A protein has these predicted regions:
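A generic alpha-helix structural signal
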Residues: 33, 101-104, 138-141
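Extracytoplasmic/periplasmic C-terminal soluble domains
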Residues: 133-146
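Structured extramembrane domains adjacent to transmembrane segments
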Residues: 53-133
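Short extracytoplasmic
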Residues: 41-59
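Secondary-structure boundary elements
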Residues: 38-42, 146
Length: 146
């Protein structure tokens, strides 16, 4: 009987320790998030920000980066292969809109949604695309800001 108790305790400890080891997916996400923070991205969001996005689900992530552009208060949502202006609709009649739209279309397909705020740019994208995709996104965003 004592041997069974000892075996049970040892198996419980082994099981508990195995849960502490991160999975391959979690290791990959930690590498991507580390690179993102080095590149100037803020990862995560508030409940209020999540509600502003139309395509946010728990399977995708919200990343934010400083907005150095003159573009403020714009919201684009992916429909098919293109990012479509969601708000404000009055921007479509602005003479600068074709230039903005051309730059927005250069964003990779992994970007599901992008919102330009006064101080930052928030994007929804699938983190599992890898850090190379993140660097493409950053390059495209910097191209938009210039």
């Amino acid at each position: 009987m004592e041997i069974l108790i000892v075996i049970f305790v040892i198996l419980s400890l082994i099981g508990s320790i195995s849960f502490l080891k991160p999975s391959k997916k979690m290791k990959a996400l930690s590498v991507i998030r580390h690179i993102a923070s080095k590149e100037g991205f803020k990862i995560g969001s508030t409940q209020i920000l999540r509600k502003k996005f139309k395509s946010w689900t728990p399977q995708v992530a919200i990343y934010q980066i400083k907005n150095d552009s003159s573009f403020k208060d714009m919201h684009f949502v992916r429909e098919g292969n293109a990012l479509i202006l969601y708000a404000p609709m009055s921007l479509k009649y602005d003479e600068q809109f074709p230039v903005v739209q051309e730059k927005i279309l250069l964003l990779p397909n992994s970007v599901l949604e992008i919102i330009f705020f006064q101080s930052n740019i928030a994007i929804v994208w699938n983190e599992m695309q890898g850090h190379e995709e993140l660097l493409k996104i950053k390059t495209a965003i910097l191209n938009i800001c210039n």
